[in-house]
From Swiss-Prot:
Keywords: Metal-binding, Pyrimidine biosynthesis, Zinc
Protein name: Aspartate carbamoyltransferase regulatory chain
Annotated organism of origin: Tolumonas auensis (strain DSM 9187 / NBRC 110442 / TA 4)
Source species, domain of life: Bacteria
Molecular function per GO: metal ion binding
Protein family: Belongs to the PyrI family.
C-alpha cells in the first residue's frame, strides 16, 4: 500500500474555525462553551495529524463569529489554539489566544454553598496563572479552584 491518504475537513464559507486544540479537548470545549447550543452546522475533527502537536482536534462553526473575548476563554483548555474568522472562504481575522482575566457565565461554582447556586446571577471567576498553574476564583464565595475542578463541576 504505497498510496498516501490525506484527511480532509470541508472548508466553510463563513464562520469560525478553532484550530490546534490539544487532542481530546475538542468535545470538552464543545460542551463547556455551549457550542452545541447553536443551530448552525458544526464540523468536528478529532485526533487529526499535526506537525506541532502530534495530533489535534479542530472545530468549525458555520455562520458564527467568535469575538476575541470568547476566543480567549478557550485558552483555559487550549492555550496554543487559534481562532480563525472566515468570510467568503478566506481567513479575515486570526485570534492568538490569551488567558482572560475573568470568565463570566461559562462554569458553575464547585462550592455547593456558593450563593450563585441560589440566586439568579451569572457565574463569575477571576483567572490567575501562577507558575504555570491556572486557578479560578469565584467572585461570590471567593474560593479558588483549579480549571479541572471547575470544568468537572459543570
Amino acid at each position: 500500500m504505497s498510496e498516501k491518504k490525506q484527511l480532509q475537513v470541508e472548508a466553510i464559507c463563513n464562520g469560525s474555525v478553532i484550530d490546534h486544540i490539544p487532542a481530546g479537548q475538542g468535545i470538552k470545549i464543545l460542551k463547556l462553551f455551549h457550542l452545541l447550543d447553536t443551530r448552525q452546522r458544526i464540523t468536528v475533527g478529532l485526533n487529526l495529524p499535526s506537525a506541532a502537536l502530534g495530533s489535534k482536534d479542530l472545530i468549525k462553526v458555520e455562520n458564527t463569529q467568535l469575538t476575541a473575548d470568547q476566543a480567549n476563554q478557550l485558552a483555559l483548555f487550549a492555550p496554543q489554539a487559534t481562532v480563525n474568522i472566515i468570510e467568503d472562504f478566506k481567513v479575515v481575522t486570526k485570534h492568538q489566544l490569551e488567558l482572560p482575566g475573568e470568565i463570566v457565565g461559562v462554569f458553575a461554582c464547585p462550592n455547593s454553598n456558593c450563593i450563585s447556586h441560589r440566586e439568579p446571577v451569572r457565574s463569575r471567576f477571576g483567572v490567575r496563572s501562577t507558575q504555570g498553574e491556572v486557578r479560578l476564583k469565584c467572585h461570590y464565595c471567593e474560593k479558588s479552584f483549579t480549571k479541572e475542578i471547575v470544568s468537572e463541576a459543570f
